From Swiss-Prot:
The keyword Cell inner membrane applies. GO terms for cellular component: cytoplasm; plasma membrane. NCBIfam families: PRK00218.1-2 (NF001246), PRK00218.1-4 (NF001248). This is High frequency lysogenization protein HflD homolog. The keyword Membrane applies.
Length: 205
């Protein structure tokens, strides 16, 4: 039997990354706690439970759950829809490419080693994360076209933050697949996903 609770949390992680990308592209900034939750997820590679990936508590996925609920209600921004569905598509490409998976694992391991020297949200670490996305994930499929303010999108730091968040979105998409998530559920079990998302969201204080 599918564990829809865990599937929804992972999918909320994907949607949270999509929302952060939108914020960065249109405002050049994102909610700092939510942004850190996304970055931190890249460093939790052996969680005991799915909540551990997102700071140990579902409240850290509040923005993602809100976004997912709007999306499942067909009330969401079309760009957000494109972002999170593109992340799921890229995860599908990644799962079929053993070389890319191995390289990604190696690069994430090296990323974790850099924690000794740099804060996770430092410009150096953001650049490393962005390069991992550009080198490994981006070539796997159709590039995600980000819409926003040209002035912001030209800034290297904003570009790096967006790519780092997209990498975190891939992390959540991998987790979604591991939890038993499928695209068929989004098509045929939307009500179940929506009800579960609302139930989890209502538990956040």
């Amino acid at each position: 039997m599918k564990n829809y609770h865990d599937i929804v949390l992972a999918l909320a992680g994907v949607c949270q990354s999509a929302k952060l990308v939108h914020q960065l592209a249109t405002e050049s900034r994102a909610d700092s706690d939510t942004f850190l939750t996304a970055l931190n997820s890249l460093f939790i590679t052996q969680p005991q439970r799915i909540e551990d990936v997102f700071g140990g508590e579902v409240r850290h996925l509040k923005l993602g759950l809100e976004t997912l609920i709007h999306q499942l209600n067909a009330q969401g921004d079309q760009n957000l829809t494109r972002y999170w569905l593109s992340l799921l598509a890229l995860e599908g490409k990644l799962s079929k490419n053993s070389d890319a998976k191995q390289t990604l694992g190696n690069r994430i391991s090296r990323l974790k080693e850099q924690e000794i020297h740099y804060a996770r949200d430092s410009e150096t670490m953001l650049s490393i994360m962005a390069n991992i996305y550009s080198d490994i994930i981006s070539p796997l499929g159709k590039k995600i076209h980000i819409l926003g303010s040209p002035d912001y999108l030209r800034q290297e730091l904003v570009q790096n933050k967006i790519r780092a968040v997209l990498l975190a979105g891939i992390r959540s998409a991998v987790l979604w697949k591991q939890m038993g998530g499928t695209k068929w559920q989004i098509l045929f079990f939307r009500r179940k996903l929506l009800a579960t998302a609302k139930q989890i969201y209502s538990s956040i204080y």
